[in-house]
């Protein structure tokens, strides 16, 4: 897979862009995030689908808004029947394309997390 790029998708929890020096925050130094931003792809016009973390993460994971994927609060993880319901996550799509995928850290979108 040497001809494919590595993909690292960071899901920060409650991190505002005005608290990052790469976006102009002068009161804080964030060199590691700045390096990732400089060498990767930044989405300057990206907006969260939900102000609540679990629905927002599920929306990113599924490509569907909270109403369509069925996760509208922090009390539910991803639907246990999501595959039977025809929902495919982008990590699954990457895995199907031959990528090794992994989820590390606090996610709260799987019921066993």
Language-model features, listed with the residues they occupy:
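Formylglycine-dependent sulfatase
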Residues: 1-113
